[in-house]
């Protein structure tokens, strides 16, 4: 694959899916259950997330991802870009002031949070 002819990470991902066998392992999550996701599983989840995200945002909207390092982070990131959004990843280790600054600066249309125990400051942005 000549990646110099590709325009985005999304395009690279979907080109790669054409080259690999769908059942081939792609992502492994070591916590909590050491689950392995194959290319087919991941692509299906990305398409489903893309459809949902497209129904919630407009082209160019910023979408925040608050998540640990896990397979769904990658799936969400690709789905946001595939839906025409701009991914704004933030770490779970940030302080409340960091979150507030980022939220005020980027004004996301969508916030994806991996677990309900992860919280952001509660106010309208």
Question: Where on the chain are the PLM-derived regions?
Answer:
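Conserved AMP-binding/adenylate-forming core of the ANL superfamily
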Residues: 26-70, 74, 78, 95-100, ...
């Amino acid at each position: 694959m000549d990646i110099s002819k590709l325009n985005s990470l999304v395009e690279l991902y979907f080109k790669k899916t054409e080259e690999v066998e769908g059942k081939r392992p792609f992502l492994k999550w070591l916590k909590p259950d050491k689950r392995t996701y194959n290319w087919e599983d991941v692509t299906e989840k990305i398409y489903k997330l893309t459809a949902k995200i497209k129904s919630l945002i407009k082209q160019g909207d910023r979408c925040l991802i608050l998540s640990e390092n896990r397979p769904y982070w990658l799936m969400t990131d690709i789905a946001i870009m595939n839906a025409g959004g701009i991914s704004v990843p933030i770490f779970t280790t940030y302080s409340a002031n960091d979150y507030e600054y980022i939220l005020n600066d980027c004004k996301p249309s969508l916030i994806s949070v991996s677990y309900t125990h992860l919280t952001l400051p509660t106010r309208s942005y």
